[in-house]
Amino acid sequence: MAKPVSINIGSVDFNFVHSLVKLIANRNCPEITLVGLNIGPFEEGNEYETPFWIAQELEKAGIARFREEERLDTTKLYKIQWTERVQTVGYISKLPENFYPKLRRCLTELKEEASKAPEKLREYEKSRHVTQDIVNSRLKKIVSLASAPPQTEQTLKNFTNEERFLYEQLNKLIHEWKTQILECKEAGE
């Protein structure tokens, strides 16, 4: 039986939240002790690496900020959208690492900003539209590749974990369907 998509995406998201990210200290801060975990001390301007969930809390507290390359923003989304549009159906480009978890968080942040400042609503709506375009473009490519003969690892290496899971499920389903349709059996067998 196929593994539910929500379990796969949840698993990828769990791994992302616990993956190491880089951040820069905004100010000096002594060592912080949590249950079984010590973080810091932090010196203003220095770069540190912590699990994403800790970095997120440090950012909320104003102690640190994410490095620019750790973030996904509207400008990066537009570049990705452009890249997806100019490529052929048989080729899928490499997305930034942890693209979908970062995308979900980017959209959540924009939505929260829009709820507090109505002038941000337009940016949120544009980002949402661009995101939908990226997802639809990649989905078309995944479906096309999944219905073609098996792909080489070279082709599949640009898939994200979420996309590879979808590709494998679709490929298996399409292959089984084709086999059933094209199977030559006598009536009544």
Predicted regions located by residue number:
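Compact, well-ordered interaction domains used in eukaryotic information-processing assemblies
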Residues: 29-72
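Charge/polar-rich, low-complexity and marginally structured segments
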Residues: 2-13, 71-189
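Generic structural hydrophobic/aromatic packing signal, biased to beta-strands
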Residues: 23-25, 50, 66, 103, ...
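Short N-terminal secondary-structure initiator segments
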Residues: 17-19, 44-45, 51, 88-92
